[in-house]
Amino acid sequence: MAHVAEWKKEEVNELKSLIDKYDVIGIVDLLNIPAKQLQEMRKSLHNKAVIRMSKKNLIDLALEDCNASKNNIVDLSEHMEGQVAVIATEMNPFKLYKILEDSKTSAPAKPGAIATDDIVIPEGDTGFEPGPFLGELQQVGIPAKIDKGKIVVSKETVLVEAGEEVSAAVASTLSRMDINPMEVGIDLRAVYEEEAIYTSEVLAIDEEQTLADVQNAFRNAFNLSVNAAIPTEETISTIITLAYTRAINVGVDAAIMTSETSEPIIGLAQAKMLALASEVSGTEGALDDELAEKLSNVAVAAAPVVEETVEEEEEEEEEEDAEEEAAAGLGALFG
């Protein structure tokens, strides 16, 4: 039987203790992160999360041993890529992912690095005087020329597509142009919480879109609850108001007299009476003196509105005439 180094046993035990202590356990990739930057990131996570670097096979062993108490946690082994480390926290996976993503910074492209996104060179002035750098740009595939005493990029260009390797020449050119296209930070590969594994694809959500979706779902649920008359804490007030309004309308339409409906019923009846009286007012003897007076009062009350409208129209016409005269005067002035 092969002898197992004591330090490996201790390392597995410490990993197991860490995994057992926290509810949320993740696998992160620390590849290509400079030591100083990693130290700053770990400091920023102080009291929020613990990062422990270790060998993949030792992490595998720790996950297997912890699978009895944390069902399915062994599945994290499927997501170990790059320079692996374990991250342990009490934050929910989505918050952890956001914090790690927000901590990422831009960095220069190194020869041999794989572009995670398209590296785009924008159109415009490079800030360089005419010289050998023009040939260097053209050599790596950047359309450049001299314009007004400066080297300019004549057209926006995708220099390196996502997934392609950055050559030494391209890395040198990008460095001289002060373009830092790479993103350096802790990559969260997968997280375990309550027997579920969340990959980075699941955790990468659009916060604004998610909020809009939740608000839309709430509106739809609210409307459904109101229309189906399903009372809840949020909808009961609206349901009662809607029911009251509908009851009043039914009472008015059916001429059922109550303390709430009597006034609108009488008002509606009077309006119908006056409308009918107006229709027959041209027939001699059709209206008694009282009804004729009421109809006359309605007509007089409406007259000022009509006169005011006519006056406003006349004023508008006068303003338009004045504007046309002014325009004609300006036309004559400027030939």
Curated annotation (Swiss-Prot):
Its function, per the record, reads: Forms part of the ribosomal stalk, playing a central role in the interaction of the ribosome with GTP-bound translation factors.
Under the subunit heading, UniProt states: Part of the 50S ribosomal subunit. Forms part of the ribosomal stalk which helps the ribosome interact with GTP-bound translation factors. Forms a heptameric L10(L12)2(L12)2(L12)2 complex, where L10 forms an elongated spine to which the L12 dimers bind in a sequential fashion.
- SUPFAM superfamilies, per database record: Ribosomal protein L10-like
| HAMAP family in the cross-refs | Ribosomal_uL10_arch
Q: Which organism is it from?
A: Methanobrevibacter smithii (strain ATCC 35061 / DSM 861 / OCM 144 / PS)
Q: Which cysteines are joined by disulfide bonds?
A: none
State the coiled-coil residue ranges: none
Q: Which domain of life is it from?
A: Archaea
Q: What is this protein called?
A: Large ribosomal subunit protein uL10
Biological process, per Gene Ontology: cytoplasmic translation; ribosomal large subunit assembly
> Which PANTHER family does the entry link to?
60S ACIDIC RIBOSOMAL PROTEIN P0 (PTHR45699), LARGE RIBOSOMAL SUBUNIT PROTEIN UL10 (PTHR45699:SF3)
